[in-house]
Amino acid sequence: KTLLLTLVVVTIVCLDLGYTRRCFNQQSSEPQTNKSCPPGENSCYRKQWRDHRGTIIERGCGCPTVKPGVKLRCCESEDCNN
């Protein structure tokens, strides 16, 4: 029983069950906010582009595909997309 319990604990620690990535999600110059990403989503992104309003910045979970002319930075650590 002790060996089985040890294996279960080691497995949980190694897999880090229940862990979710946290990313910033404020837009452009809004106050800084962040959110927990859905389970299995391990990336954060920061998209930046210019339009008639000026420079627009979008942040969130994942690493989306972007159109030409949009700068994209993806990263894989806590709150790395500011």
Curated annotation (Swiss-Prot):
**InterPro entries of this UniProt entry?**
Snake_3FTx, Snake_toxin-like_sf, Snake_toxin_con_site, Toxin_cobra-type
Q: Which GO terms describe its molecular function?
A: acetylcholine receptor inhibitor activity; ion channel regulator activity; toxin activity
Q: What does the UniProt keyword field contain?
A: Acetylcholine receptor inhibiting toxin, Disulfide bond, Ion channel impairing toxin, Neurotoxin, Postsynaptic neurotoxin, Secreted, Signal, Toxin
Localization:
Secreted
Chief location of this protein within or outside the cell = secreted
Q: Which GO terms describe its cellular component?
A: extracellular region
Span of the secretion signal? 1-20
**Tissue expression remark:** Expressed by the venom gland.
Q: Does the keyword Disulfide bond apply?
A: yes
Question: Which pairs of Cys residues are joined through disulfide bonds in the record?
Answer: C23-C44, C37-C61, C63-C74, C75-C80
**Domain of life of the organism in this record?**
Eukaryota
Q: Indicate the family of this protein.
A: Belongs to the three-finger toxin family. Short-chain subfamily. Type I alpha-neurotoxin sub-subfamily.
**What is this protein's function per UniProt?**
Binds to muscle nicotinic acetylcholine receptor (nAChR) and inhibit acetylcholine from binding to the receptor, thereby impairing neuromuscular transmission.
Q: What name has this protein been given in UniProt?
A: Short neurotoxin OKI-10
Native species? Laticauda laticaudata (Blue-ringed sea krait)
Lineage of the organism: Eukaryota, Metazoa, Chordata, Craniata, Vertebrata
